[in-house]
C-alpha cells in the first residue's frame, strides 16, 4: 500500500529545489479534503477504492461527522514526475517531496488557514465551478497574497455541469472564465514588485479543471500533448490556442480569432471543441448506454478498464473511465511541482515579510538562501494535540539550518525582545517527527525548507514562536489573523471542586487553537472568546471532552464592544496629582476609520516603524501635522492598538522623566475604558500642557500614573463617548424562492442588505448583508427554518460600527449599563467630576 519509505522521504528533504510546501485553501464545501484524498491516494497512502469518500485528512471524529474540516492537518507526499515531462528550472531529479496541508474552509476557522499559510510557499485554491468565488475564497486568497504565497487554481465539481445542470460547452467555458477572472481580480491588485505577477491562467498551465469526488482532472497541457502530434504543432504553442477567443477552421485548415469561418459558418471555440467536447461525448455515451460509441472512443483514447470494472454502469462507470482517461492527481501534482516555488526560490522574496530583524544579519541571510549550514531558524505556527493527554507537538517550518533530536535551542515566545531574558528558554528538543495526516513518523533530523513537528517544546510556547540557535536572532513575525475573537462566554465547572481541572483545561485550549482567547475577569469568571458561534461551540466541546475532561456550564454568548469618541473634547481636561503638585492638561479627538483599520492591520503604519517615515506617511496620506506625527508617544492597548497618545506640548521641563509613567497609564486606560471597561479604539489623546514639581521626588510614578489615567478618562468622557459593536459580513446562497424569507430574517435582526446578484450558470442567488454580531446568535437556525433549509449563510467579521453616543442614545446607554452590570462594576457610568478638576 505505501510505496515509499520514510528513508526515501528523508533523502529528498536535503534536495531543497525538489521540495514543495503547499496548502489547499477554499470556501467551505468546495471540496478541499476530497481533492486531497486523490493526491494522497496517488502517493500510495490510502487505497484507490476509498479515495474521495474517506476524507483521510479529517483526523477528528467531529470532522468526520459534520463533514467539515476544523483543524488543518499536514501530510508529506512522495511524487515521481513522469520521465517525459520537462523538469522545472534548477531541478535535476524526477523525485519530489510535496508537503500538503489541508486547511478548513469554514470562516470561523480561518485562523487555522493563516497558520497553514505561514509555513507554506504555495497554495492550491479550490473553487466550486457552480458557486464561483465566495466570501471565504476571497478572504483566504487575500491572506495568501499578503503572506507572499503563490496560488494555482483548481476548478472543482465539473461533473455537476455535465450530469446535474447539463450546460452546453460554451456556457461551461464562460462559467470557468468568470471564476478565473474573479480570482485574478483578487490576487492581481497587489502592487508587490519583488513578488511579481501571481495571476493564474489556463494557457500558462496554472489552472486545472476536474472533479475531486470522481478523481479526474486536467490542465490544458494534457490535451496539448494529445493534439500536438496530430496537428504537428509544438505543445506550448498549442496551449495558448486552447483557451480564449481562438477557433479552428477545419475547411481552411488554419487557426483564427474570428468566430466565423471563411464561408460564414459559426465556429465552435477551440476550448469547447478540443477539450470539453471529448469529455462530454464520453460521459454522454456512458449515460445513454451507447456501448458501440463508448468502445470506439475508449480505443482512440487508449483507455483500458480493469477487469473488475467490466460490470459497472451509470455514474460509477463515468468515474472509472474518466479516472483512467484524466487522472486528477497526476495533473494537479505536476501543476504544483512545475508552477509553485521551492523553498530555495520562495524564501528569497518572503524573508522581508517573515523576519523582524535587519535584512543583513546572519539569520536573515541564511533564511534568504535557505541555507542548511546557517544558524537554525524555525517558526512554530501552531500546536497539535498528541494522543498523550495534555501534550502537544509544536508544528512549524524550518527556514534555515537543521533541527536535530537532542539539539540545544533557544525558544523565543511572541514577546521576546533581542538582548533581554523575557520569554526566552534554553532547552533541548526531545524528538523530531514527520506529520502524516493521522499518524506521525519519527525522524532523526530535519533540514531547512521542510515542515516538521517537535516534541518537548510545548511547555514553553503558548501558540506560536521562533526556535533558533543564534544568539542575535530576532523573532519571526507574528501572524495577523483576519478574524478576531469577538464572541465570548463565561464557563464554570458543574461541580465546583473541579475548578483546578477547568483552569488547566483552559490553558491547554489556548494552546491548541491559534485564535481562541482564554482569560479571567476581575469578577472571577473564566472567559473563552472565539471567532463565531461554530468556533466557540467546537472549542467548548474540546474543553469539556479533551482538555479538562469535566462537565462545564456556560453562560449565553456575549459580544465584545469597543469604546470610542465622536468629536473633540468640549473642554480642556485637567487632573492634579494626589499631592497637588503636578497638573496634566489633555483633550481627546477621534481618529479616522481608515487609519484605525491600517493600524490594526499593521501593514502601512505600526508602532515598530521608524518615527520619521511614519510622520511623513501620516502627513502625506492622513492630513496630520508633521510635528504632531513625530511626537506619537505610544500606540495602545498592548502597544499596538488603534489609539494614539500624542505629545503636543511646547517647551515643558522634565517631560521625558514622566514619559514612561504616562505611557503605562495610557496602556492601562485604553485596555479598560471608562464607559464599561472595554478596550478603546480610534481615540487620539493630545497632551497639551504639563506643570511638574521641580523636585524629582514629588513627580514619581506613584503621583503620575493615577493622574494620567484620570485625565485620559476625563478626555474620553468630554468627547461624546460612543460604543462600537462588531459587524459581520454575511453571504447567503439560496434559490430565488427563498429570498423573501432571508430579507425578513435580516430585517428582524438589524441586518442591512448591501447587494444581491444572480450566479450565472446556476439557479442560485447570493445576498450580501451586514449583520451585527450581537444579533447573530441562532441566526443560521432561524434562517434555515424560514427558508425550508435552502439558505446557507457564511459570516465573516467585517468592521466595527457605532451604536450611538453614550448618555444620549437609548440603545448605547442600555448596552453600556448592561455590560457594567455583567462585569460587576458600579451600576452607573462615572461622572466627569470624578476625573476632571477645576484649576
UniProtKB/Swiss-Prot annotation:
<dbReference type="GO" id="GO:0045335">
    <property type="term" value="C:phagocytic vesicle"/>
</dbReference>
<dbReference type="InterPro" id="IPR004161">
    <property type="entry name" value="EFTu-like_2"/>
</dbReference>
<dbReference type="GO" id="GO:0003924">
    <property type="term" value="F:GTPase activity"/>
</dbReference>
<dbReference type="GO" id="GO:0005829">
    <property type="term" value="C:cytosol"/>
</dbReference>
<dbReference type="InterPro" id="IPR014721">
    <property type="entry name" value="Ribsml_uS5_D2-typ_fold_subgr"/>
</dbReference>
<dbReference type="GO" id="GO:0005737">
    <property type="term" value="C:cytoplasm"/>
</dbReference>
<dbReference type="InterPro" id="IPR009000">
    <property type="entry name" value="Transl_B-barrel_sf"/>
</dbReference>
<dbReference type="GO" id="GO:0003746">
    <property type="term" value="F:translation elongation factor activity"/>
</dbReference>
<dbReference type="InterPro" id="IPR035647">
    <property type="entry name" value="EFG_III/V"/>
</dbReference>
<feature type="binding site">
    <location>
        <begin position="26"/>
        <end position="33"/>
    </location>
    <ligand>
        <name>GTP</name>
    </ligand>
</feature>
<keyword id="KW-0342">GTP-binding</keyword>
<dbReference type="InterPro" id="IPR005517">
    <property type="entry name" value="Transl_elong_EFG/EF2_IV"/>
</dbReference>
<dbReference type="InterPro" id="IPR000795">
    <property type="entry name" value="T_Tr_GTP-bd_dom"/>
</dbReference>
<dbReference type="Pfam" id="PF14492">
    <property type="entry name" value="EFG_III"/>
</dbReference>
<dbReference type="Pfam" id="PF03144">
    <property type="entry name" value="GTP_EFTU_D2"/>
</dbReference>
<dbReference type="GO" id="GO:0009617">
    <property type="term" value="P:response to bacterium"/>
</dbReference>
<feature type="binding site">
    <location>
        <begin position="156"/>
        <end position="159"/>
    </location>
    <ligand>
        <name>GTP</name>
    </ligand>
</feature>
<feature type="domain" description="tr-type G">
    <location>
        <begin position="17"/>
        <end position="248"/>
    </location>
</feature>
<keyword id="KW-0648">Protein biosynthesis</keyword>
<dbReference type="Pfam" id="PF00679">
    <property type="entry name" value="EFG_C"/>
</dbReference>
<dbReference type="Pfam" id="PF03764">
    <property type="entry name" value="EFG_IV"/>
</dbReference>
<dbReference type="GO" id="GO:1990904">
    <property type="term" value="C:ribonucleoprotein complex"/>
</dbReference>
<keyword id="KW-0547">Nucleotide-binding</keyword>
<dbReference type="GO" id="GO:0005525">
    <property type="term" value="F:GTP binding"/>
</dbReference>
<dbReference type="InterPro" id="IPR027417">
    <property type="entry name" value="P-loop_NTPase"/>
</dbReference>
<dbReference type="GO" id="GO:0043022">
    <property type="term" value="F:ribosome binding"/>
</dbReference>
<dbReference type="GO" id="GO:0031012">
    <property type="term" value="C:extracellular matrix"/>
</dbReference>
<comment type="function">
    <text>Catalyzes the GTP-dependent ribosomal translocation step during translation elongation. During this step, the ribosome changes from the pre-translocational (PRE) to the post-translocational (POST) state as the newly formed A-site-bound peptidyl-tRNA and P-site-bound deacylated tRNA move to the P and E sites, respectively. Catalyzes the coordinated movement of the two tRNA molecules, the mRNA and conformational changes in the ribosome.</text>
</comment>
<dbReference type="InterPro" id="IPR020568">
    <property type="entry name" value="Ribosomal_Su5_D2-typ_SF"/>
</dbReference>
<keyword id="KW-0251">Elongation factor</keyword>
<protein>
    <recommendedName>
        <fullName>Elongation factor 2</fullName>
        <ecNumber>3.6.5.-</ecNumber>
    </recommendedName>
</protein>
<dbReference type="GO" id="GO:0030587">
    <property type="term" value="P:sorocarp development"/>
</dbReference>
<dbReference type="InterPro" id="IPR005225">
    <property type="entry name" value="Small_GTP-bd"/>
</dbReference>
<dbReference type="GO" id="GO:0006414">
    <property type="term" value="P:translational elongation"/>
</dbReference>
<keyword id="KW-0378">Hydrolase</keyword>
<dbReference type="Pfam" id="PF00009">
    <property type="entry name" value="GTP_EFTU"/>
</dbReference>
<feature type="modified residue" description="Diphthamide">
    <location>
        <position position="698"/>
    </location>
</feature>
<keyword id="KW-0963">Cytoplasm</keyword>
<dbReference type="InterPro" id="IPR000640">
    <property type="entry name" value="EFG_V-like"/>
</dbReference>
<keyword id="KW-0597">Phosphoprotein</keyword>
<dbReference type="InterPro" id="IPR041095">
    <property type="entry name" value="EFG_II"/>
</dbReference>
<feature type="binding site">
    <location>
        <begin position="211"/>
        <end position="213"/>
    </location>
    <ligand>
        <name>GTP</name>
    </ligand>
</feature>
